[in-house]
């Protein structure tokens, strides 16, 4: 079935409290999607953010971001007063200020925690359900706060290396903070589950994003060092990244520790199966970031200042996904297969049967044989994007692309004026044979270059994009609905209205 989606992270939702929340504006956006004939909402990882504010560099592969917790729902539960949060200065409505959030959110959540009944049966059941990861995460965060946010590698050696007696003493000493971080996760997932249920009941599927790697300063590396290539002091032997290319002359040095794939193979990929089971339980579909890293991954010696020196090493390939399928059954997954894709990577993707990705912004650099041009799609089993969170907005792209790309795009799209290219690029994405077409919310809102979500290989100024409620008006909803009607991407229950709406487009054109 042909479908459409919009990519917008929770952080970008309209909100009066510094960042998007799992509250009223999230439900209103779901209503907007339904009204627009859109059946998919894609978000970025829900994980807590750390240094650099990236959801792809988190303290945990499982935890939810405390900043997204809706204060209004806590007030409704009698845990907060309205004045506890409503009168504060949350900064600009146009940009997320993560430093301000760090300073302001936790005292408010701590006040709600003090009023919370920790004997609540739902909370007790939540802790039991998530006992595989929650206790270690809560202790990790309690210790991090006790050490003024320092990385675990800077803690006392007996804590960094997880001496059993020292951990037990720390758990007793910081019991209130440990329980605080457990309660935060209970609130987060209670609100997330409620939102997901609402979306699903209204015909909207949620696509979540799973990074392939975890951060070095994460509870996984601290509590399960055997999963990674570390030395006896638990320092990385090598780290992840990408080799140099035309876009990045020195490559991309991500710095994530690499997996000990021999260990994972010996355990039957148990950790990965658990991680995939969790991801597919909180999302309807999971996008796996840097999928090519499962076939082969770029290894950079630890301590190197750039990614210029490194080597490709073999990953688990299809063995991991066969093990996951045997344990969990068929999973709703698609692969981020962008970048340096070899025949071996394509063979792995084909063997798994997962959809790959097509990005329209990449379509105009190599002439008529470019694989990202819709005419060259080989299968409907793919997801077509106007652009991803790592790309420029369409309006930004048309003023930043090379003259050669713009010239070809004009000829291909039969457009004379550069300013008309974004609309045509959106249309060919929707008109492609891809089963699912997704556009960045910025592209529907016709946002300029400074609305870009992330610029790879830059450390600051990313992940800050926000929207306002007035942007999601009836005019935009009608435009998106008509686009879906014209290109047969309406949900099945909306098909009967499609012919009428297509005629409206013809009349308006």
Task: List the model feature ranges, each with a label.
Residues 1-11, 27:
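N-terminal regions that are enriched for targeting/export leaders
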Residues 9, 15, 53-189, 214-438, ...:
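Alpha-amylase-like alpha-glycosidases and glucanotransferases acting on alpha-linked glucans and related
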Residues 24-49, 281-283:
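Catalytic domains of carbohydrate-active enzymes, especially glycoside hydrolases
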Residues 34, 192-200, 325, 349-350:
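Surface-exposed amphipathic alpha-helices with a cationic face
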Residues 44, 205-207, 211, 285, ...:
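Outer-envelope exported proteins of Gram-negative bacteria
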Residues 181, 186-214:
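Conserved, well-ordered alpha-helix/loop/beta-strand core segments that scaffold catalytic motifs
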Residues 446-505:
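Structured C-terminal cap/extension of enzyme domains
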